[in-house]
Amino acid sequence: MEYHEAVNFLFDLRRFQVKPGTESIRRLLSHLGDPHEGVSFVQVAGSNGKGSTARMVDAMLRESGAHVGLYTSPHFDDVRERVRVDGRKIPKSALSAFVAEAKPYLVERAADGEPLTFFETVTALALWYFDRAGVDVAVLEVGMGGELDATSAVDPVASAVTNVSLEHTAVLGDTVAEIAKTKAAVAPADAPLVTGTTGEALSVIREEAGDVLTVGDADADSDADVRVSYGGRVNHQEAAVTVETDAETLDVRIPLLGAYQARNAGIAVSLARQVRPDIDAEAIHRGLRNAHWPGRFEVMGTEPTVVLDGAHNPDACAQVATVLDEFDYDDLHLVYGAMHDKDHGEMVGALPEVASVVTCKADISRGEDPEILSSVFERLNGPAVETGGAVAAALDRARARADPDDCVLVVGSLYVVAEARTTWTRAVVPKTHRTLDDARRTLDRANVADAAERSERARRAVNRTVHTRVQRRQARVLREELLSVGGDCAVSGHEFGGELVDVVLTGTLDQFERLTAALEDPPYALAGVAAEIRETLDIEAADAGEDDERGAGDASDAGHDDYPWNDGTAVMGILNVTPNSFHDGGEFYDIDDAVEQARAMVDAGVDIIDVGGESTRPGADEVPVDEEIRRVAPVIEAIADLDVLVSVDTRKAAVGAAALDAGADILNDVTGLEDPEMRFLAAERGAPVIVMHSIDAPVDPSREVDYDDVVEDVIDELTELVLLAEKAGIPRRNLIVDPGLGFGKSKAENFELLGRTDEFAALGCPILVGHSHKSMFSLVGEEPGDNLAATVAGTAIAADRGADIVRVHDVPENVAAVNVALASRDPNRFEADAERED
């Protein structure tokens, strides 16, 4: 079964109405062999905050070393976001395999008049995949209520009810007491039910669940078992929180703003302790600080401040208002869209005073008509109200009217927030087609449905080709406009709204110029897509020189004017001052040997020297911070005056800070900013930072990682890391991306990454390729350990495919390879250099 067929089948199940209860999903799970029976589950229910709490539990358990599944809803761009293992989305191949196995049973049940719903089936998908992935524990966000929710097909080892308010009253009941009763049913058999409820809801939960562990505010609820305090914002991304029990006090930071998130953090810590009683404080600190949760008071930019929040009921809107009070701004400009079944009057009434409003509608049938939403504001609030259409266009208008000291808030629905967020996350990936097979593979990966259409369009895909994901209504416009100027556009076979669809655009540069000019028409809400196409294909725009909507400049202009990667491929020389690094471990452990090697690299033409004090080879032990600083800082200080940039290869922010103090220019983090302090260090010091895609560091050779398409999957995951870094205050011009060859990829996948290096230009950042002497070369018959010839060949390929930096051990040979690759494209640059020397 092809992926688009599987996804279309799942979304077609949305036509079936919700029937509360677990009998249907239990039967499906039985048909699948009861995959849930071998997995430990944590269940998180609540009217608000259950998704944030589930994410915090997931992050802490992963930091403790557990293999963790996470199931949440709804999704933003891709249904696979709902099901994750260790932070990675379920592969397309696994989703397709599940649907192929479950479809006959689901069709039979529908024929009998007992169809399963979309949510029931996707919940079964999650439980099936968690078993297949062999997770240690899985965290489930309850969909609605508790007792009759599909997630209650499992017997949890730990559970929570975050809070209770009026919601889904037609199903759950008309009172807080009734709703609390159904939520209390998630209580585990052998552990207290953790809850942040108060008043009547808490009384009902105590009566229903019996054994309860309460979490409350330290001031108001001094009798709570776990007491939390909210210390307010410490920067524009993080808040200080204290979690206190009779046994310990934890002062932590969380990347989720708002006093209510402090209570969620207390609940999450309690759940993590129940699952892993021996979890240490460091895992709790790092887990909470890495618990990023998109669309929950997510600050996307400054000047003006832009905030995305998926608040979709009155209580959540009131919470947004309290968090906004922590920010200083002049006027508030609102982008508002919501579902038709929500209490719009109460939601609008809970929001703070606004200067202007643009209403909008997400690309989903449940979305409320923007005219109706406008009338609500006109009656209740009285600001300047504009009736909009598409979310992207509404966001553009709000940002255009906001001054630098104002705030733009997108609120009302996670579906609306999801569409707005693509302004920052959408990637336009350039494709190089050397053969018809290359073109066919691009169309296959984009899930173009019809085989004949794939074959026909492959023959046309011989000019410039890019691949991106947009809303279906935007895909229709792209196709019509590109066809009208003589280009071609293939669209994936996804048939249902609310899910982004793949588009593959092919044409000459002239055709793309005409397309992007047409897309500037405001009704299309595609100006952002046009800007990204121009940037990817290096097309001059009428407003050339301005940054795109994400604030990213052209990749070729990324960084300071003097950075060597702005003038062709730069060579980074590896200087390991360790006793055990692979290939050169121990050779430069002595400081005098290290300095001598650095000088030799400079003489050979190196552009950057990368100093590392900890090995990431398989089985390497972690080096304490003090020892790593002792190794790298003196070497960096000794070579800082050389005519070369110096980077430090470390995954620890404390080591990075010491290295910068010693004279380093660049931070090279092989864990992709896993240390939450690293991104703030880079922002504060203004240092470029290399962000690598890695699964494990040190490398775990036994770890098997599933990719559908390793290049596009890595681009997808790096997109969020780049956005995370930008939100911390690092300008995109200071971000360098590393696909992470050798880190959680097979040998064949490493070669795929090398051969398609140019596609990483979609991220708008310089690209680093690190392939030196790696075991990947055994795929082509090279002996492990010393692969100089293969490394040099790889360097030439990387330079030819657009790498901005290559990281290597052997500088002279690789400088020569880079020069040959550059000369093959632009020999005149070398003639000019020779004339200057003469």
UniProtKB/Swiss-Prot annotation:
Keyword DNA-binding: no
Cofactor(s) required for function per UniProt: Mg(2+)
Chain positions recorded as Mg(2+) binding sites: 576
Organism of derivation: Haloferax volcanii (strain ATCC 29605 / DSM 3757 / JCM 8879 / NBRC 14742 / NCIMB 2012 / VKM B-1768 / DS2)
Pathway in which this enzyme or protein is active: Cofactor biosynthesis; tetrahydrofolylpolyglutamate biosynthesis; Cofactor biosynthesis; tetrahydrofolate biosynthesis; 7,8-dihydrofolate from 2-amino-4-hydroxy-6-hydroxymethyl-7,8-dihydropteridine diphosphate and 4-aminobenzoate: step 1/2
Region listing for Disordered, in residue ranges: 541-561
CDD domains: DHPS
Protein task: Can complement an H.volcanii mutant strain that is thymidine auxotroph because it lacks the two dihydrofolate reductase genes encoded by hdrA and hdrB.
Record InterPro entries: DHP_synth-like, DHP_synth_dom, Dihydropteroate_synth-like_sf, Folylpolyglutamate_synth, Mur-like_cat_sf, Mur_ligase_C, Mur_ligase_C_dom_sf, Mur_ligase_cen
Enzyme Commission code(s) on record: 6.3.2.17, 2.5.1.15
Pfam families: Mur_ligase_C, Mur_ligase_M, Pterin_bind
Chain ranges of the Pterin-binding domain: 569-819
Positions with a binding annotation for (7,8-dihydropterin-6-yl)methyl diphosphate: 616, 649, 668, 738, 774, 807-809
Region ranges (DHPS): 571-838
Binding site for ATP: 46-52
Protein name: Probable bifunctional folylpolyglutamate synthase/dihydropteroate synthase
Swiss-Prot/TrEMBL keywords: ATP-binding, Folate biosynthesis, Ligase, Magnesium, Metal-binding, Multifunctional enzyme, Nucleotide-binding, Transferase
Recorded GO MF terms: ATP binding; dihydropteroate synthase activity; metal ion binding; tetrahydrofolylpolyglutamate synthase activity
Family note: In the N-terminal section; belongs to the folylpolyglutamate synthase family.
Reaction(s) catalysed by this chain's protein: (6S)-5,6,7,8-tetrahydrofolyl-(gamma-L-Glu)(n) + L-glutamate + ATP = (6S)-5,6,7,8-tetrahydrofolyl-(gamma-L-Glu)(n+1) + ADP + phosphate + H(+); (7,8-dihydropterin-6-yl)methyl diphosphate + 4-aminobenzoate = 7,8-dihydropteroate + diphosphate
